[in-house]
Amino acid sequence: MQLSEDEFKTHYWPDRACWSDGKLDRLPKPLQHPVLSSIDALTANYKGRVSFGNAKTGSRTVAVEHISPDMLLKMGLSLYLTEIVRLIPGLTELLREAESAVGAPPGCARIGAFIAPEENGVTCHMDAEEVFSIQLIGEKRFFISKQKGLEQPFGMQFNPGDVTYDDMYPQSTAGFPDPDASEFECVEMKPGSVLFMPRGTWHRTETRGLSLSVSIILRPPSAVESVLDALRARLLQDSAWRRPLHGAWGQGSERIAADQQFTQLLESLPDIANGLTLEDVRQTAYSENDRNENLGPESYFQVKPESTLKLTMKGQSMQAKVIARDVDGREFETMQLDVPLPMIGVFEWLSHTRHAFSAASMAQSHEGLPLEQHLRILLALVKGGYLKPLWYRPLVKG
């Protein structure tokens, strides 16, 4: 089966498993790198963290550093090399392309290499993330099944019979997932084969000889994580939500007062939650660098309390210096620039402003400059350590 990107996204992503076979030369160029064309070359050049285990004896894996992958492989162990992105040029860009293709936030994808000796692999488990397995060397079988007991699992990998993490309990009030209740399908993987497994797919593997594959794993934040992150930023702006529930763990009148306080908080919650937008949620997943690359009129900023903008007139222009303080209390100059006459008013305003503000509000207060110029000034002061780009909308707008 050969699928176009549109066909895959329309009919399979993110909830249906699918696979396709083809030649290695159809794969992205980074996956055709010489180091990934030879297990000997990979184990000789890889210097990062290694997780190893033996599916013949159980699901347990151990992660170590500063060890020879080749030595572990000769001991009959299956290996997972988690840091190949440092070794293979172009893998970082490939991950960003994968994220963009499915509308996932930057940084949520990772890639690792699996090496397994003959008749080994991984024991039956399910992952709480989307997985693309790409076979590069050798052959192996995937046995997969749609997990019936728990839709959209959250948290970590679940291995039946292993110690269960706490977040699985509220997800499994009807009983924990059981692979014995599922019907498995065998997928034959050859060099060039690609398998997509939605989160929650039961799977185990068996190799037919020495095998090398890579997995591209996407872990976008769940709705729970995204909404709670956005909601937290709004609640922290309200002193009523910052106040502890004093007396809640006490008795009598103390607990009654805490219960009244809690009731009032819950009554205010719908209005606060209804004010959230998808953009509020999106912003929580971006790094500061991502936000810097996408500044716009609705971007918000605040002066860092540990930084100072010093302004000195020099004829018809002004010199601006940013002085910042590090975690050890040391002060140092982070940037210096000459400010032309039309921008002096903006810099004077920025040197005195302490409340959060948007790029649009700053531009409206200084209409002599176009918005694009305001954004360039803001970005320069962000990079200089004077301004903090905010990941939330202030309730009191400036």
Residue spans of the language-model regions?
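Short amphipathic alpha-helical interaction segments
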Residues: 368-383
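Conserved double-stranded beta-helix
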Residues: 187, 233-293
